Amino acid sequence: MRTLIIVLSFIVVLPVWADGHLSTEKTVMQLVMDHWEARDNNDYETQADLMSSTGTYNANSDGSFFRYSGNVSADDLENSMGGQSSSLNVKYPETISLSDDVVLSRYYLEGVISDDGGTVNNYRTRVTHIWVKEKSGWKTKSWHFSPLHDGGRHITSSSDFEED
């Protein structure tokens, strides 16, 4: 009986180890954290390096339409985001390997964002973030931000953060 349990355990666990999902998902999870740390530190070079060289597909939390952004340089990011400051926290991150070269990450992002137009003290959004493996490593290919204010229909409570 003991031998049967051990054999069945290997049958269930071995495919996950064999295809590298665990290490891939951990790698991408760290890149998510690295990106937002770079954002908070105005490290445009790191942010640009984490973007796909063939561009990204984006939908921002400001309600703008889906858009494509071509290859973005550190200078481009500084020109568009210079003067902003942020203190953002990634909450409840998950990474899911969809194939050998595509990983879905999803998480909540909350914190404070400021620019010349003012400060958002309660920035909260959901992020669906697609990473692809390119020659130079894992890169952001697409992301969608959806604000968590939900039109006033939902009041956040502690149960929103409880595990099932």
Where are the predicted features?
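N-terminal hydrophobic targeting signals that begin at the initiator methionine
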Residues: M1-R2
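Bacterial N-terminal signal peptides
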Residues: I5-P15
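Short, low-complexity N-terminal intrinsically disordered segments enriched in polar/charged residues
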Residues: V16-L50, S158-D164
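A solvent-exposed, acidic/Ser-Thr-rich amphipathic alpha-helical stretch
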Residues: L22, K26-T27, D43-D101, Y107, ...
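Short beta-strand segments enriched in hydrophobic/aromatic residues
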Residues: M51, L109-G111, H144-P147
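Short, cysteine-centered beta-strand-loop-beta hairpins and adjacent loop/turn segments enriched
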Residues: G83, G111-N121, H149
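A short, structured loop/turn motif at beta-sheet edges
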Residues: T95-L104, G118-T119, W131-K139
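Low-complexity, intrinsically disordered terminal/linker segments enriched in charged
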Residues: T125, K133-E134, K141-D164
